A protein has these predicted regions:
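A short glycine/serine-rich beta->alpha loop
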Residues: 53-54, 70-77, 116-124, 154-162, ...
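C-terminal nucleotide
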Residues: 1-63, 88, 92-124, 220-381, ...
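Fold-level recognition of mixed alpha/beta catalytic cores in primary-metabolism enzymes, strongest
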Residues: 160-248, 430
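Glycine- and acidic-rich phosphate- and metal-coordinating loops
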Residues: 135-157
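Structural signature of FAD isoalloxazine-binding scaffolds in flavoprotein oxidoreductases
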Residues: 77-96, 215
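Beta-strand segments within the central parallel beta-sheet cores of soluble alpha/beta enzyme folds
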Residues: 100-102, 147-154, 184-195, 334-339, ...
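Glycine/serine-rich anion-binding loops at beta->alpha junctions
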Residues: 59-75, 155-172, 376-394
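Phosphate-handling active-site elements
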Residues: 140-148, 176-192, 397-410
Length: 430
């Protein structure tokens, strides 16, 4: 194991270029940026924790949701892809029983006393709660983890729908798994992270985000049994045809204050399920749902019913998207992407907040996307939890400049991210 200074020197000399190219691509422009980024993270680690310590460096990717918008938490299907935007963590094991994490862009140093295993008062919705919950998740699985010191630098847009939280969680999890030799596989790490987010952070999330960051590539998941989801990895290479680029646009409105809106989607879907003798919609026979629409409208309200309609139709679409990708039929996949986006807008109703109709960044971005991309073979949709954050578009290369210019006119310079899908999940890089 090398010291932070030794790793900085090795990175600058190009000794880690192959490892970086496997994650981000091998162009000199990309490698130069990542050398600088990793070197800066190592320098910051030294600033906070001192020089001369032996360290390891980890990466956990963000994800883009490709299908299955708000279906995973109802025990349906999910489809997502790991992306090249990621969190990098420099970490060194310690023996004092504390986890310390300093994250770029945040003033506070998270300090977790591992003797305090229970959720702490006032800590929910803060990163410290995730760290504490992940450590306790390992211990509940029989792995006696201890302390470490870490510095993290994330390029995953916070509150944007690319799941910065899952990247952070998986960064912490892969550190503990590696530093303490726990040997847990990627799905097990994802479940620990979900436990931390649900129980300690206080957000009722599904599992797809964590699974995608853990496994990498394009991931199709069947959550009929959420404790042991069936997953299928579709290799990232070849998913996008030549001449088509994945573009994610940040509308620069954050998800960070929208936990209540996300929870309402789940609660309303489950209210419909309860009227049909299920806990979640995945336990409900679709035929019976359609037969009992009048009663469901009366008991649950129209929005809950529309969100249930979205679930059933989106679930079928997600399976069809998976089949299209496996068959290499991007045209069919793109048509399904558009239908998914319309369903999220019209039925799931998570494109803007009804309580704040003046602020509709996602709606505006989708409207402009449709005006540019309709009939071109491209596609567009909102992604992630919704209400704010990012939209996703598959843009023909001939239209990239026009498309990005239109988005930047609305949301400012640098709002468009041209992404690649990433084959590797959370991993120790060096």
């Amino acid at each position: 194991m090398a010291t932070s200074r030794q790793l900085r020197e090795q990175i600058a000399a190009g000794r880690w270029d192959a490892a970086l190219a496997a994650l981000y691509g091998g162009s000199e422009e990309v490698l130069s940026r990542q050398r600088s980024r990793y070197g800066a993270a190592l320098e910051q680690f030294e600033l906070y924790y001192g020089p001369g310590r032996q360290v390891q460096v980890y990466s956990a990717p963000g994800r883009t949701e490709l299908g299955g918008n708000h279906t995973d938490h109802q025990h349906g299907y999910g489809l997502a892809g790991a992306v090249t935007l990621d969190l990098v963590a420099v970490a060194s094991r310690n023996e004092d029983g504390f986890i310390r994490v300093k994250s770029r862009g945040f003033n506070k140093l998270d300090v977790i006393d591992l003797t305090e295993a229970e959720p702490q008062q006032g800590e929910s919705t803060h990163s410290a709660s995730l760290i504490r919950g992940i450590a306790e998740g390992f211990r509940a699985k029989g792995c006696d983890v201890g302390g470490f010191d870490a510095y993290t630098a994330s390029d995953v847009l916070r509150g944007s729908g690319l799941s910065s939280s899952a990247a952070f969680e998986m960064g912490v999890a892969i550190i503990l798994n590696t530093e303490y030799g726990c040997g847990m596989d990627a799905p097990a790490l994802a479940r620990i992270c979900q436990f931390a987010e649900n129980t300690y952070f206080g957000k009722p999330s599904g599992l797809l985000d964590q699974l995608t960051s853990a496994v990498g590539g394009v991931l199709f998941a069947d959550f009929a049994d959420p404790t042991a989801p069936k997953i299928e990895k579709i290799h990232a290479d070849g998913v996008l045809p030549e001449g088509m680029t994945l573009c994610v646009t940040d509308t620069r409105a954050s998800h960070s204050e929208l936990t209540g809106e996300f929870a309402a989607i789940r609660n309303e879907m489950e209210a419909v399920a309860a009227c049909l003798d299920g806990r979640v919609l995945g336990e409900v026979e679709e035929k019976r749902f359609w037969q009992e629409l009048p009663r469901l409208r009366e008991q649950c309200g129209d929005r809950a019913v529309l969100r249930a309609i979205h679930y059933f139709e989106e679930n079928a679409r997600t399976l069809a998207q998976r089949d299209a990708l496996v068959a290499g039929d991007f045209a069919a996949f793109a048509r399904l992407v558009e239908k998914s986006g319309h369903s999220s807008f019209e039925c799931c109703q998570n494109v803007y907040c009804a309580s704040s109709p003046k602020h509709q960044g996602l709606s505006a971005a989708l409207a402009i996307s449709q005006s540019i991309l309709a009939g071109t073979g491209g596609a567009w949709r909102m992604q992630g939890g919704g209400f704010a954050g990012t939209i996703q578009a598959f843009v023909p290369d001939a239209l990239i400049k026009r498309y990005c210019a239109a988005m930047e006119a609305l949301f400012g310079p640098g709002c468009c991210y041209l992404l690649s899908l990433r084959e590797q999940g959370a991993v120790r890089v060096m």
